[in-house]
């Protein structure tokens, strides 16, 4: 294994991403940001096809995988996640959106807010993305500035509806494509957007003092070195030599020791909350750790099957169910990075739950999950998101 370049932490690190309706320009904007910042020596220009390159992409013409690019502004280092736009692939948005300290909501001025605009705002709210900046894209294609004003008002109203400060949220107008093509004015708007992101999205208070927890997103083997689990550190810190537990999906807790750590393909001394890292685990076989489990500080989190939850059930126009559900309903609960089937028991006096309801009920999972009070999840059936919520009380 060749000596890796060492990742040096000099600027505060922030995770952001692009969200919004399919074809409104999320990936084009991501490419434009890297291109404009590259001219200042703060990024490597990534072209659209690089960011958009996911094997499934070519077959169906829709973005499926979550792309991560990195860049810097004068003030910060960013990891930027390009959230998939298509409703069928909201599953990846769920793993992705959970990775954001703030989001850039991309809305095409030619269209205004669309169903997935609403869906992504809702998901951002549910997975704890507290700061959104708006980029009104394709403004060059709208002749009447009053129409753009109208779209901006609609977007602000929609954000307010989901408890964001719609009146105060910064809105930048521009054209990602023109910026990508080198138009000076369009590029200035991209710089303005990044200045606003720098200022409006606060440097997150990292949860570095809490016990280490990292949901496992991917597992792979490095020949001759062992098994690597990768994901975003949820809280705490990790370094080589630390003892960790692999928790979830099975009753038995597996213990291991961290023997290597890297980020952005560079070795890392200390991984901390918010970092996307690969953790090399001693004495663990490739099949002993799977997506959906968590790596955790010993004794810090247990597995549970039964809990109480506060849940928002999506309305039909948000892509949710058309009909109510009752006790004994058995959907999938998407925790951390995986689906687990669970049975719902409604509280006494509640006969059914309607789309659009905000409700509380008890869940019994068929497999143990590494959860605690405050753990967020989404509810899915047949591949579509029908609800979102969080654990309010552990019952077993």
UniProtKB/Swiss-Prot annotation:
Binding site residues for GTP: 20-27, 82-86, 137-140
Region feature G5, mapped onto this chain: 175-177
Pfam families (alphabetical): GTP_EFTU, GTP_EFTU_D2, GTP_EFTU_D3
Residues the record lists as binding Mg(2+): 27
Catalyzed reactions per annotation: GTP + H2O = GDP + phosphate + H(+)
Main location: cytoplasm
Residue span(s) of domain tr-type G: 11-205
EC number per UniProt: 3.6.5.3
Subcellular location as annotated: Cytoplasm
Subunit structure: Monomer.
Family under the similarity heading: Belongs to the TRAFAC class translation factor GTPase superfamily. Classic translation factor GTPase family. EF-Tu/EF-1A subfamily.
Protein name stated in the entry: Elongation factor Tu
Organism: Lactobacillus acidophilus (strain ATCC 700396 / NCK56 / N2 / NCFM)
